[in-house]
Swiss-Prot record:
This is ATP synthase epsilon chain. F-type ATPases have 2 components, CF(1) - the catalytic core - and CF(0) - the membrane proton channel. CF(1) has five subunits: alpha(3), beta(3), gamma(1), delta(1), epsilon(1). CF(0) has three main subunits: a, b and c. It comes from the Bacteria. Produces ATP from ADP in the presence of a proton gradient across the membrane. Belongs to the ATPase epsilon chain family. GO terms for molecular function: ATP binding; proton-transporting ATP synthase activity, rotational mechanism. It comes from Lactobacillus acidophilus (strain ATCC 700396 / NCK56 / N2 / NCFM). Keywords: ATP synthesis, Cell membrane, CF(1), Hydrogen ion transport, Ion transport, Membrane, Transport. Increases 2-fold following exposure to low pH. The keyword Ligase does not apply. It is a peripheral membrane protein.
Amino acid sequence: MADPEKLFKVIVVTPNGMIYSHRGSIVDVRAIDGERSILYNHIPILTPLAISEVKVKRSREMGSRIDHIAISGGYIEFSNNVATIVADSAERARNIDVSRAQAAKERAEKRLREAREKHDERNLERAQVALKRAMNRISVYNARGH
C-alpha cells in the first residue's frame, strides 16, 4: 500500500485579494537569496521573494499537476503546514494575457532605452523592474505548455 500523501495548504494573496488557494505536496519559490522547495512539515520560515514563478505540485489524485503562478516579489511564510505567499501582484499562468504581457515588455524596453539615453537612474530602475515583471509573466505563461 502506498504511503499517504502529505499535503499542506498553499495560499497566494495580493492587495486585490486571494489569487490561489489549494493543497499541494511541494511549493517551489525563488527567494531573494536563492531557490527554495517547501514540503509538508518544513520548518517555519518567513522570507522575501524575487520577481519569479511559484510552482505548486498538486496531489497524486490531481495527476501530480503543477500550477504555475507569476509573482512580482513579496514574501512567503510557512508554519503549521500552511504556505502563505503575500505578493504585490500575482497571476496564475492560465489567467495571463500573453499579448498584454508582450505589450508591457515592449513598453518597458522602450522606457529602458530612453532612460539610458537620458542617464536617468530612477526611471532606469523602474523600467528594469517593469521588464522583469513582463518577462516573468511571459515565461510563466509559456511554462504551462502554451
